[in-house]
Amino acid sequence: MTQLADLRRTYVLGALSESDVAPDPMSQFKRWFDEAVTAKLPEPNAMSLATVDADGQPSARIVLLKGIDDRGFTFFTNYESRKGLDLAANPRAALLFHWVQLERQVRVEGRVEKVSDDESDAYFATRPLGSRVGAWASAQSREVPGRDVLEQREQEYRSKFGENPPRPPYWGGYRLVPTALEFWQGRPSRLHDRIAYRLQPGTGWQIVRLSP
């Protein structure tokens, strides 16, 4: 087996200072995200979403960012999935973007709210037909006897709805409204740059440097 202690790399691609970053974190995120897209990274909108249930049990999974604006970060899912039930019990969550090739991470924390039905309908209509049918066929996060059951359900809903399946009432979007963000740039000797934004009531965003 590979010796895990030997798996390491030196980070040399960039630096980040307080004078480099935008005054608000959403502008800074868009800047870094655009650079990740320009670098042709695979799925730059992939992010880890961490939630906590009513008993304090955490869980995490990779989801795709589908919207970003001054209000926050938008993603879509089944409201009855594990993450949906977690968010119903505890509407706070964390996101993590890891752009390995750029030696960068972005951490986001905040409260989560459902987007409007109109927003969910508009996004659902852009999804491929198979994904729209799949939203009906899959009771996400629940046990299923076998893949054949999923495929049978898919065929049933494809026959039922044809080319225009509507959005299921249990499926839609969430928006994470950030209260804290951290931008991490790898540096040599593990002295990484960590610039954090913290939302201060009544005064806006505070920018601070954190020790690596």
UniProtKB/Swiss-Prot annotation:
It is an enzyme of class 1 (oxidoreductase). One of its GO terms (molecular function) is FMN binding. Its cofactor is FMN. SUPFAM superfamilies: FMN-binding split barrel. The keyword RNA-binding does not apply. Binds 1 FMN per subunit. Keywords: Flavoprotein, FMN, Oxidoreductase, Pyridoxine biosynthesis. Substrate binds at residues 8-11, 66, 123, 127, 131, 190-192. Coiled coil: none annotated. GO terms for biological process: pyridoxine biosynthetic process. FMN binds at residues 61-66, 76-77, 82-83, 105, 140-141, 184, 194. The keyword Transcription does not apply. PANTHER family: PYRIDOXINE-5'-PHOSPHATE OXIDASE, PYRIDOXINE-5-PHOSPHATE OXIDASE. Belongs to the pyridoxamine 5'-phosphate oxidase family. Homodimer. Catalyzes the oxidation of either pyridoxine 5'-phosphate (PNP) or pyridoxamine 5'-phosphate (PMP) into pyridoxal 5'-phosphate (PLP). This is Pyridoxine/pyridoxamine 5'-phosphate oxidase. The gene is pdxH.
